Amino acid sequence: MYPASPSAGPALHPVPHRARLPRPRCLAEPPRSPAPGPGSTARPPPPAPGPRPRVAVKMTFRKAYSIKDKLQAIERVKGGERQASVCRDFGVPGGTLRGWLKDEPKLRWFLDQLGGEVGTQRKKMRLANEEEIDRAVYSWFLTLRQHGVPLSGPVIQAQAEAFARQIYGPECTFKASHGWFWRWQKRHGISSQRIYGEAEPPVAGPAPVKEEPAQPSSAGLLLDGTPATLPHSEGGYGDEQIYNANVTGLYWRLLPEQNATPGTGDSREPGECSRRWCSDRVTVLLAANLTGSHKLKPLVIGQLPDPPSLRHHNQDKFPASYRYSPDAWLSRPLLRGWFFEEFVPGVKRYLRRSCLQQKAVLLVAHPPCPSWTTSMPAVEESEGTPRQCQPELLGSPEELQTPDGAVRVLFLSRGNSRAHIPAPLEHGVVAAFKHLYKRELLRLAVSCASGSPLDFMRSFMLKDMLYLAGLSWDLVQAGSIERCWLLGLRAAFEPGQQPAHQVEEAAEHSRMLSDLTHLAALAYKRLAPEEVAEWLHLDDDGGLPEGCGEEVAPAAPPSPASLPSSIGAGEEEEEEATEQGGVLVPTAGEAVWGLETALRWLESQDPREVGPLRLVQLRSLITMARRLGGIGPSAAASDDGV
């Protein structure tokens, strides 16, 4: 039998191995797990082979915090609160909070550069590329808006290009584009408003105290540039935004023993002591807000244009400032300079630190004018007529205010009429400051009992007085300032009501007088309490004493009988102590040179850490060493200790 022949058709060739198609795999079902019996436990099925499914993770959005929030967190940490609780309240990790604490100087600097309430709302510290042009345009804008002049975008852009040519020269390629103008608006928080109608022409002369709202003008774009502060005509000041300043006279190194003229008893004229110690009298300006939480540095005004003890020293480190006046009085230029150089920057820093609106008002009582004998330039007057107090002595409120009107001065009414409003600080705060100052002065005198009162007066310099004035002002409690504000403002509403804290103030005054009497008894054995009380209230007139403008002879040193009994008792013991065998005793010149070297080193340190006590004691030792060694006073000491 023959095999069957193949069917007709093309011959089938075997497919190469590399061209063969893969054999399809059969998808086998996963084995079923047996049903659990009554005594067995169910196990979860094993995970299926292959990649695991991805789980969607919800991303947290990054939150940008404003400078105001950062400063609030910083103040809470500096106030003693734990960092963990602050982080929990703000919802930030600990590293972010520590970064804010590290960048605090940068945040403060940025607010100083930008200023205003808008700066605290910024989330990025980014200034303009052309800072000079930006500041010039903003200052020009505030000046015109204060006078009610409407401004449009093209006008501001043209003025910016004009400022650029003035600052960088005519070859400047700066272009005030629409983008620059938009960023400038956002940077300073200036909004655009469209107004209609017709505006009145601006009033010639200085800007009025109460700015009237602008009348509608022709259709145009009005830029309202008061987002940071409300107009001062709207009021709305908080307790921490209301300040008061008052001046007082002070004999800064007069001791109780020098108050009375030796050997004259009660025949001394009333103004004799004032004329004798006129060169030691200064005027002190004190300022604080209503709550007492912000007390500015005291301003001391003296008759020395360049005190030797203040040379080569940075006065910014002292707790009090010093200014020169020929009659030691707060003149108009001094008040204006203090307002713009110290008061306005200090108040704005405090308001930014407290996250408050950038506006404040300063209430100033017209201080009593100097005596007619004082050499001050004035109008023609008769010889027998004393000078009357004139309001223009210190300037007008229009001049004492910032360009935007946010910080300004208001003068309280004077006179014996019912409209008279006494200054709040006159109700015990100024007296408390002077009592504290004289108490610290007596403590220094008692600590330097090894020398005479004249040695102490030569050792106690004006630099020590500035430190002592700042220390005494810091000792005045905030509650006392707030209570005196209530007593002072009550006269405007309840003229006949008696103070509620009169008994408490009398008790405090009695305790202070007792302390001063005790300290005076330690230094002066023959001093009566009445003489201490007279010395305590010697400069309570508030102004310059009569006769200070006259030329007076320098006061003679006190007689030996009036000196404390403990003074000069140890000179013989010191002479006996020098006769020591085998010990090389230094000469008086070497001792003075070593003490002066130590004094120069001590004066170069921070005055807040050193304090006036160590300096006065060391100067007293130098004076005593010169007197014992028969050495004349040095060139630095020839300026009568100032």
From Swiss-Prot:
SUPFAM superfamilies: Homeodomain-like. One of its GO terms (cellular component) is nucleus. It is found in: Nucleus. It holds the Pfam family CENP-B_N. Coiled coil: none annotated. Residues 121-194 form the HTH CENPB-type domain. Residues 31-52 have a biased composition (Pro residues). Residues 56-107 form the HTH psq-type domain. It comes from the Eukaryota. The keyword Nucleus applies. Residues 1-54, 198-230, 543-583 are annotated as: Disordered. Residues 83-103, 154-187 bind DNA. GO terms for molecular function: DNA binding. Keywords: DNA-binding, Nucleus. Residues 198-208 have a biased composition (Low complexity). Residues 239-364 form the DDE-1 domain. Belongs to the tigger transposable element derived protein family. This is Tigger transposable element derived 5. It comes from Rattus norvegicus.
